[in-house]
């Protein structure tokens, strides 16, 4: 092995970006096949490919950062910038959905009956399951902060407890959201209200599932003593992402559930 005179990580060639792109192609193509031909085969293949890619890519990053020491302070600084820019891009992603919602609701067209919610739509009560979901995500924001402080103080037991609570709250939120979708009186095909509601809240739900997976990986790493009080960017990135998911939900609740109803 040649001697390295700089602090940067020269990444080895990896197949995972290619397999990740392939799984994205299979998933999007699979959704089209599912919607038009009621065939779920491509979706299953795409999901399997994506899960395998996630596992192996995460495994490589954990190996490089924890066991090989490639994640120097300089590399961690670059990773932090990358995570911040990723969250900024996600903000603009959700901004498009809010724009579509307000564009449709502030000046309803005659086709919608000139009112919002459109004629025939019975919106969900914001003081029932949506309010419970809000309290769940706010509580999870508190518990993830508790986990972060416990990690920085070297309190392993409390960190595991707090992170486990956050994961359980995330799973509970997902179950409640799924039951709410199942019991709602309108669908994604019910005009602009249905499409904006289900796309905005559905993508948020997907982000909750991704964030919960991220936190589960962090919990498994904590069990294996991968984090220290000074070297834990993987957990820090997951916590930032989770706080972002919390804030997006507050805007969704106020805009779509409360004001929009």
UniProtKB/Swiss-Prot annotation:
Quote the cellular component terms of the Gene Ontology held in the record: mitochondrial inner membrane; respiratory chain complex IV
Q: Which residues lie on this side of the membrane: Mitochondrial intermembrane?
A: 35-40, 106-128, 184-190, 257-261
- Major place of residence: mitochondrion
| Entries under PROSITE patterns matching the protein | COX3 (PS50253)
Q: Indicate whether Membrane appears among the record's keywords.
A: yes
Q: Which residues lie on this side of the membrane: Mitochondrial matrix?
A: 1-15, 67-72, 153-155, 224-232
Task: Identify the EC number(s).
Answer: 7.1.1.9
Q: Could you state a single Gene Ontology molecular function term?
A: cytochrome-c oxidase activity
Instruction: Note whether Transferase occurs among the keywords.
Output: no
Q: One GO biological process from the UniProt record? A: respiratory chain complex IV assembly
Q: Top EC class per UniProt?
A: translocase
| InterPro entries listed in its UniProt record | Cyt_c/ubiquinol_Oxase_su3, Cyt_c_oxase_su3_dom, Cyt_c_oxidase-like_su3, Cyt_c_oxidase_su3-like_sf, Cyt_c_oxidase_su3_a-hlx
What keywords appear on the UniProt entry? Membrane, Mitochondrion, Mitochondrion inner membrane, Translocase, Transmembrane, Transmembrane helix
Q: How does it sit in the membrane?
A: Multi-pass membrane protein
Which reactions are catalysed by this chain? 4 Fe(II)-[cytochrome c] + O2 + 8 H(+)(in) = 4 Fe(III)-[cytochrome c] + 2 H2O + 4 H(+)(out)
Where is it localised?
A: Mitochondrion inner membrane
Q: Which domain of life is it from?
A: Eukaryota
Q: Which residues cross the membrane?
A: 16-34, 41-66, 73-105, 129-152, 156-183, 191-223, 233-256
State the family named in the UniProt similarity comment for this chain.
Answer: Belongs to the cytochrome c oxidase subunit 3 family.
Under the subunit heading, UniProt states: Component of the cytochrome c oxidase (complex IV, CIV), a multisubunit enzyme composed of 14 subunits. The complex is composed of a catalytic core of 3 subunits MT-CO1, MT-CO2 and MT-CO3, encoded in the mitochondrial DNA, and 11 supernumerary subunits COX4I, COX5A, COX5B, COX6A, COX6B, COX6C, COX7A, COX7B, COX7C, COX8 and NDUFA4, which are encoded in the nuclear genome.
Q: What does this protein do?
A: Component of the cytochrome c oxidase, the last enzyme in the mitochondrial electron transport chain which drives oxidative phosphorylation. The respiratory chain contains 3 multisubunit complexes succinate dehydrogenase (complex II, CII), ubiquinol-cytochrome c oxidoreductase (cytochrome b-c1 complex, complex III, CIII) and cytochrome c oxidase (complex IV, CIV), that cooperate to transfer electrons derived from NADH and succinate to molecular oxygen, creating an electrochemical gradient over the inner membrane that drives transmembrane transport and the ATP synthase.
Q: What is this protein called?
A: Cytochrome c oxidase subunit 3
Which source organism does the UniProt entry give? Osphranter robustus
Tell me the gene name: MT-CO3
């Amino acid at each position: 092995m040649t001697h390295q005179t700089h602090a940067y990580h020269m990444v080895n060639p990896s197949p995972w970006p290619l397999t990740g792109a392939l799984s994205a192609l299979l998933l999007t193509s699979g959704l089209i096949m599912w919607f038009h031909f009621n065939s779920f085969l491509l979706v299953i293949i795409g999901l399997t490919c994506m899960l395998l890619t996630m596992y192996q890519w995460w495994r490589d990053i954990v190996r490089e950062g924890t066991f090989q020491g490639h994640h120097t302070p300089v590399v961690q600084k670059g990773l932090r910038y990358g995570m911040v820019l990723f969250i900024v891009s996600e903000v603009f992603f959700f901004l498009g959905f809010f724009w579509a919602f307000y564009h449709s609701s502030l000046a309803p067209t005659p086709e919608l009956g000139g009112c919002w919610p459109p004629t025939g739509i019975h919106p969900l009560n914001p003081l029932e399951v949506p309010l419970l979901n809000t309290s769940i995500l706010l509580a999870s924001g508190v518990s993830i902060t508790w986990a972060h402080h416990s990690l920085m103080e070297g309190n392993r037991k409390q960190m595991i407890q707090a992170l486990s609570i956050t994961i359980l709250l995330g799973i509970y939120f997902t179950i409640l959201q799924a039951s709410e979708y199942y019991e709602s009186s309108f669908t994604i095909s019910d005009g602009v209200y249905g499409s904006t509601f289900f796309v905005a809240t559905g993508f948020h739900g997907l982000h909750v599932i991704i964030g919960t997976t991220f936190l589960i990986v962090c919990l498994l790493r904590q069990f294996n003593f991968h984090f220290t009080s000074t070297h834990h960017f993987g957990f820090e990135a997951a916590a930032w992402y989770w706080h972002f998911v919390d804030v997006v939900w507050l805007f969704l609740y106020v805009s779509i559930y409360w004001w929009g109803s």
